[in-house]
Amino acid sequence: MPRPLVLMILDGWGINPDPSNNAVAIGRTPAMDRLMAEYPSVEMETSGMAVGLPDGQMGNSEVGHLNIGAGRVVYQDLTRITKSIDDGDFFTNPVLLDCMARVKAAGGRLHLGGLLSDGGVHSHNTHLYALIELARRQGVKDVFVHAFLDGRDTPPSSGAGYLAELEAEIGRIGFGRVATVMGRYWAMDRDNRWERVERAYNTIVKGEGAHRPDSAAAIEASYSAGVTDEFVEPAVIAPNGSPLGLLADGDGFICFNFRSDRAREITRALTDPAFAGFDRSPWPRLASYVCLTEYDATFPLPVAYPPESLANILGQVVSRAGLRQLRIAETEKYAHVTFFFNGGVEEPFPGEERILIPSPKEVATYDQKPEMSAPLVTDALLKRIDEGVDDVVVVNFANADMVGHTGILDAAVRAIETVDECVGRVAATVLEKGGALIITADHGNAEMMVDETGGPHTAHTNERVPLILVDDSRKGARLRPGTLADIAPTMLGLLGIPQPPEMTGKSLLVATE
């Protein structure tokens, strides 16, 4: 058994045959080039049905880590919720119906807040439309939408189109109004930057921010100032000079994001009695607050689509075998190598340790520091490998994804080169210790930095990703192409641990010499 066996996830590092505007191709990557030439490698599918998403839907970090850790294709929340809308179950969901009943009993209004996007990473606009239709059917007095604009998982200036589509759907349904508009930068932080969340809160609750006559005027004003979707300043829709729909006592709120990590902070701010992130007076006492999926197991809030438990995932199987495992990443991807990798469970398994390296807070966006905390992650990992404590290690390097999201090619190239340097350092140490290294990615991003219009490409891609098996005892091994679900079975095979029946992925190892 190789010790340690290190799974290195290069977040956002995809394979694009077109080298133009491709940070992965442009960057100098001597370590990855050498390892690819010397060791068995293969291309992996990370999008669509291969990871439990709808056909053609790009993968993302949450989905990728869930599939890798589970060793099976995990039916994603997006697919699950969309299917329930199609078959009608959505409209009889007891948690959603209870929320609306409570709002009606309190004489309140219903607020729907979340990412207005069809990017499918954090939310889907069709889920919002279904909620508006459900509220109409249930006879709710008023529905107000708090639209967080995307620009990361969608083109950076696509928000105007999504708002126009929302207004058209509201017109078709004959119900609902847009109350506030803001970029996701404010409402969907995940790194305790409470000053951002405070701006979102103050807009939704207090009506602070620019007052605009309608949603189109709000986005047009932002574009005129050169500010694209992600960073749109919080604006209040006030057609007659006073805000249409501020959140107040007796109202209900449904957060329609299905991905948890960027929905937690705004949810805490709106619901937690002990919240101390900023002064939020007034704090509305709501009739109901519903999370579309489980954002945090400790939140005492109703969940419309609770998690489906996953048995015998990689971390659990490794733990039961009596092996020690380490999860290590910087803040931006720490939840992915822990919570998501463990099937949506926060608690570590016995024998599982975790190291969190803080992401840089001194910059507003990571194009200003493309190396992020990757060198510090590497230093901490090498120290740990030298100590010889762990049997299995999962490490994530966030750079290709987080800097790729900025749409700035030069910065993404520097990010790629930083990660390559870290790969080289880790590979040398692991091999020196007699260990093995699986290098892969959860989805693509930095390999496409310009979109078809010639503008910045800030979203994930549907491209395949590499997988390299760096193991001196298996240089002659043959690998087959696969999906992320096949990585855990491959690792168990290398560790000599039987694969449990719940893991339906297949080992990538075809034959060894």
Curated annotation (Swiss-Prot):
Quaternary structure and partners: Monomer.
Binding site for Mn(2+) 2: 11, 61, 442-443
GO cellular component: cytosol
Species whose genome carries this gene: Geobacter sulfurreducens (strain ATCC 51573 / DSM 12127 / PCA)
UniProt cross-references to InterPro entries, sorted A to Z: Alkaline_phosphatase_core_sf, BPG-indep_PGM_N, Metalloenzyme, PGAM_B_sf, Pgm_bpd_ind
The protein's role, per its UniProt record: Catalyzes the interconversion of 2-phosphoglycerate and 3-phosphoglycerate.
Cystines in this chain: none
Binding residue positions for substrate: 122, 152-153, 184, 190, 259-262, 333
Record HAMAP family: GpmI
NCBIfam families recorded: pgm_bpd_ind (TIGR01307)
EC numbers on record: 5.4.2.12
Cofactor(s) needed: Mn(2+)
Name of this chain's protein: 2,3-bisphosphoglycerate-independent phosphoglycerate mutase
EC class name: isomerase
One of the GO BP terms on file: carbohydrate metabolic process
Gene: gpmI
Family recorded in the similarity comment: Belongs to the BPG-independent phosphoglycerate mutase family.
Pathway: Carbohydrate degradation; glycolysis; pyruvate from D-glyceraldehyde 3-phosphate: step 3/5
SUPFAM superfamilies given in the database record: 2,3-Bisphosphoglycerate-independent phosphoglycerate mutase, substrate-binding domain (SSF64158), Alkaline phosphatase-like (SSF53649)
Gene Ontology molecular functions: manganese ion binding; phosphoglycerate mutase activity
Binding-site positions, Mn(2+) 1: 401, 405, 460
Cofactor descriptive note: Binds 2 manganese ions per subunit.
